[in-house]
Amino acid sequence: MLTEKLILASASPRRAELLQLLGVDFEVIPSHMDETSRNDETPPEHVQRLSSEKAEMIAALFPDALVLGADTVVVIAGRMLGKPGNPGEARDMLKRLSGREHIVYTGFSLIQKKKGRRRTQVVRSAVLFKEIPEDEISWYVSSEEPYDKAGGYAVQGMGAFFIREIRGSYTNVMGLPLSEVVETLKDMGSLTFSGDQHDRGSNQE
């Protein structure tokens, strides 16, 4: 159970779904920021900065709460891929990823402003795509699934059949490395696993 109020500073339904797996109570208050990368940033630096800035923005409004911010990018051949803004961008991203391995970086930050507590971590996963035929790319782009996901695909959705192999955290590719988040919460003293969880199912209905 959580020992303090937790706020997820993200509008991502995937991140909320992953946190729900823990059976903990949390509030979603998205932070709306410019996610443009800086010229001098590496991908890990980019996601680390944005996750921290997202958490900091909401923590300033709720200094007593523990705020979780996160950011994810896909990187292939040194190029960062964010979220496609239109069908053309989605198609270009999938063509670029087809038959190749790419890296997914997710940065997450936990901030409790009143007590001056802050933790930030970046997690890396490698994903290998199959060769994707043109008709499959066209079908997937028309599904509308690509448009709010880094790299233009959803590992937990229809995009899963593009994937040959994942090395590293699956939940990291979804947008939140759950194992690392849990360990950080435990290390901060904000999450304990004492108590009976047999009523968890009824509490989630």
Swiss-Prot record:
One GO term describing the cellular component: cytoplasm
Pfam families: Maf
Alphabetized UniProt keyword annotations: Cytoplasm, Hydrolase, Nucleotide metabolism
Catalysed reactions listed for this entry: dTTP + H2O = dTMP + diphosphate + H(+); UTP + H2O = UMP + diphosphate + H(+)
InterPro entries named among the record's database cross-references: ITPase-like_fam, Maf-like
Active site annotation, chain numbering: D71
Cellular compartments annotated: Cytoplasm
Residues of the site described as Important for substrate specificity: R14, T72, Q156
NCBIfam families reported in the protein's UniProt record: maf (TIGR00172)
Family listed: Belongs to the Maf family. YhdE subfamily.
Protein name: dTTP/UTP pyrophosphatase
